[in-house]
Amino acid sequence: MSDIRLDSATFFKRAAKIFDSWEKPSGDTQALEDINSIAIILGDPNDEVASYTKTTALQLWLLGYEFPSTLMVFEKSPRKVTFVCGSSKAKLIRQLQPSDGIEIDVKVRSKDATAAKETMEEVVASLNGKFGSLPKDRPIGKLVDEWNSAVESKGDLEVVDVAIPISAVLAEKDGEELKTIITSAKLTSTVMINYFKSKMESIIDRGTKMSHEALAQLVEEKIGNEEKGPDMKLWNKNPSLGEIDFASSEFVYSPVIQSGGKYDLKVTAASNNDNLKPGIILANMGIRYKNYCSNMGRTFLISPSKKQETQYTTLLEVRKEALALLKTGAVASDVYNSVHQSLETKNATLADSFLKNLGFATGMEYRDSSFLLNAKNNRELKENMVLVLTIGVADLPDAKNKGKTYSLLLSDTVKIGQNGAVVLTEGCTRLSDVVMDMEEEEEEDVKPQIDKKPKINNSPKKPRSSTVGGRVLNAKTRGANREQATQTTAEKIKTNQQRLHAQLNADGVKRWEADAGGKNGAQQKVVKRYESYRREEQLPRAVEDRRIYVDEQRQSVVLPINGYAVPYHISTIKNVTKTEESNHMVLRINFQSPGQIAGKKEDMPFEDPDANFIRSVSFRSQDQRHMLKVYEAITALKKAAVKRETERKELADVIEQEKLIEVKGRHPYVLKNVFPRPGPEGKKTDGNVEIHQNGIRFRPDGPASKIDILFSNIKHLFFQPSEKELIVIIHVHLKAPIMLGKKKTSDVQFYREVADMSFDETGGKKRRARYGDEDEIEQEQEDRKRRAELDKLFHDFARRIETAAQAQQFELEVDVPFRELGFNGVPHKSIVALLPTTNCLIHISELPFTVITLSEVEIVHLERVQFGLKNFDMVFVLQDLKKPPVHINSIPVAHLDNVKEWLDSCDVPISEGPVNLSWPAIMKTVNEDPHAFYAEGGWNFLTGSGSDDGSEESEEGSEFEGDSDVFDESSGSDEDSESAFEGDSDSASAESLSDEGEDWDELERKAKRADEKHRTDRGGDSDDDGKKKKKGSRR
């Protein structure tokens, strides 16, 4: 508390306002006339009733902070304010030095009961006759008991309720207060219009099941709290907000969302656990900013009747009249009666259901009942008062749903002016803003469905989040027009692919245009200089023996050549061989030199490739033991050097993450009892995942190292439910790899096994009392229930990670795989299930993981696509041409059409061919001069059909050659391997592709009939015939 500074100027300014109203009472402050002192006491901090009470409001208004267990006594003449509180609070309050004719007296309440009692009696002794208080706040605590005891002991004191005079003083806002309330109102209207409205419409439109309470929680999280920051993506949508101190922001109450025929328009209403339903939806929410409250309430009409629209329009008219009546000098009861009478004239039914009040004053205290806008309140409204105006009608009979009712509501925060009220929470009031007609949209979608589909596919490039969803719907096309739909799909793919390939080639030429005519596409190789010894004196003494010496410390080999000791760094040595000849041993040392036959690795760069190089040097010696020792030393040194260089290259892209900033003040959100993969120490370790301010942390239960992942390094966040799996997963794919133990990784996941939640009741009473399948059925039901609970737990936690990351201005969304679009393949060594997501193709169920980001894919080439083969391969060429293509092999041919349709829907260029290609050679050619590659047609060579010669090369990979028949577009085409978008011939039509499986079955049946006929003709007595028949039946 030492860093708290009180605003002395504000305190004395506002205290003077109280004394001025006290010395010249009029109107609502008339009750202060016969009072000589006012005692305001706030009880213990755990007093839940103290929330938004007048006592709290007065303390915040004067001091800017809440001081629990504190007594304030105002004395009229002379002007004096006495504080009774603990020592720590007294130290802060003593910042207030006497000023503007107001004395300050701070009395420290002792921890000793006797001394505390004497202090309180001393304060009470200064009171005479009547004194003002706020008895309705009902504070509790030891300080309150001491005060009540001292007042009773004196006996001649009379308590007067000064709630109305205090309300009158607080009601009129100054410039700073109005500025803060306007900011509070902007926050409220922003979250209502820019988040709740769109979120609610999305839930209704998609038919998502979400409870009122859950939706209210999502709204409440947008403001942020101590565990996570605010959602700046939302708040930045309102540029008029400016700089906001979100630490001083909170919701006045949890947002109230109501639908489905159950409505409560009272201030005490709360969201229930029922799901959000179409129809009439009411939403109320309010934000408190720097202790000042605002409120906003709206009615949203989903497929309303004409009557409901008329009723809402009537409320808008009445609201407009009410705003005109709320001006300086107006009486609260007159305003209510005029509005009610106007409504009765327009619609008597609505008037009968009209609320009993139009609203209330607000500010530091959310609801000040002293200024209720009802028929009985005769108090005048003053300029710069701030009210919550509520126009509402309750329990109207619903003609659509007999037996049910609905309510309509419009609530705003308004400021009283000379000529009427100004709305501070404007927006989303017009009928067009709040009406959402679902039925008309459905009717429009049904009729022109077939006509609209081609237009959708020919439209400009769409976000991938929508295309994947569209793919799911397209896959469900059924009915009499199946062949027409299939043909339409093939034509759409063909048209879209032509556009994508043209765009790909044009973008490639433009991207590499700066390198035209040069070889800058390939990465320039750096010539490394090595200096084993700077001076001759540094050579080891062992070289004086004129023998080969291996210097491990300098990573060099010193060779005796013509009487001189010549050092060679180990990097210049390619390898060493030894040959035994009778009594001699020959040691041959081969050096790195240009012009050698290139293997899989790139050639070593040389400063001057045209210089003279020694390729090898041989030494012959009778000391076989020494030569063997030298051989082993050089070999070991070379292996160590190669290992170091390999590790350096592997760790080149590993980053050093910034420090994780932990959440302070509260415990972070935690997902307990999970296992990370890969493990921090290479072992299976359980622990908890925590969400902190700028990232997530895995905290192991054992001695293993913790894992920190920053939001800035998260590229994709996946949630994979336990459907058809034994585990439920939250998977993080990183932008740059990090070190886990001694290994680097680009993927970290946290999972929990579903099986470990199961248990058996073998031997229990229930098991012995039942027989049959009842136990198994019950166990299956329990298993499904546990799976659903676990999925929800992990999905909610993934959503919390998403929210926390977005609050830190990172674009991160939870991606869930589409299992219905999945297919099997071999990305590494074994067959696994590969699942498309909105942005990726993934396999995260087991190690090693596969995550391919579709936005980084240049083109996808389908290999071994030809009639008769059961599998095909898929090659992802990445936009970063330096990276090797990603291969997924042995995909069942039954998934070919679905894979092509999915890739096309994601706007990924596709090509296909009958054989495997030599991709290292292709990529080497591309990287040598990318501009020339794209200028000469780019990847168009992949879209040509395979030649007749190439059709015989079944599953073996072919070497890439620029003039190969495989890529010669003028060569003959194989109709069976032709792609769906590669020609207009009837043989390549969508119909023949879709019926390919049926043709094969028909051929098999014909072969079987021919075998039977052949066996009959031969008399059926040949063993060979029998064997052939059996073999044919298994074909």
UniProtKB/Swiss-Prot annotation:
**Coiled-coil ranges per the record?**
637-657
Residues covered by region (Disordered): 440-471, 944-1035
SUPFAM superfamilies recorded: Creatinase/aminopeptidase
GO CC terms of this entry: FACT complex
Q: GO:BP terms for this protein?
A: constitutive heterochromatin formation; DNA repair; DNA-templated DNA replication; nucleosome assembly; positive regulation of RNA polymerase II transcription preinitiation complex assembly; regulation of sister chromatid cohesion; transcription elongation by RNA polymerase II
**Protein name, entry field:** FACT complex subunit SPT16
Which PANTHER family does this chain map to?
CDC68 RELATED (PTHR13980), FACT COMPLEX SUBUNIT SPT16 (PTHR13980:SF15)
Q: How is the quaternary structure described?
A: Forms a stable heterodimer with POB3. The SPT16-POB3 dimer weakly associates with multiple molecules of NHP6 to form the FACT complex.
In this chain, composition skew of type Acidic residues spans 949-985, 993-1002
In terms of InterPro entries, this protein maps to: Creatin/AminoP/Spt16_N, Creatinase/aminopeptidase-like, FACT-SPT16_Nlobe, Fact-SPT16_PH, FACT_SPT16_C, FACT_SPT16_M, Pept_M24, PH-like_dom_sf
Q: Which UniProt keywords apply?
A: Chromosome, Coiled coil, DNA damage, DNA repair, DNA replication, Nucleus, Transcription, Transcription regulation
Molecular function terms, GO-annotated = histone binding; histone chaperone activity; nucleosome binding
Q: Where in the cell is it found?
A: Nucleus; Chromosome
| Stretches with biased composition (Basic and acidic residues) | 1003-1027
Family, per the entry?
A: Belongs to the peptidase M24 family. SPT16 subfamily.
Main subcellular localization, coarse class? nucleus
Q: Does the keyword Oxidoreductase apply?
A: no
Functionally, this protein is described as follows: Component of the FACT complex, a general chromatin factor that acts to reorganize nucleosomes. The FACT complex is involved in multiple processes that require DNA as a template such as mRNA elongation, DNA replication and DNA repair. During transcription elongation the FACT complex acts as a histone chaperone that both destabilizes and restores nucleosomal structure.
| Domain of life of the organism encoding this protein | Eukaryota
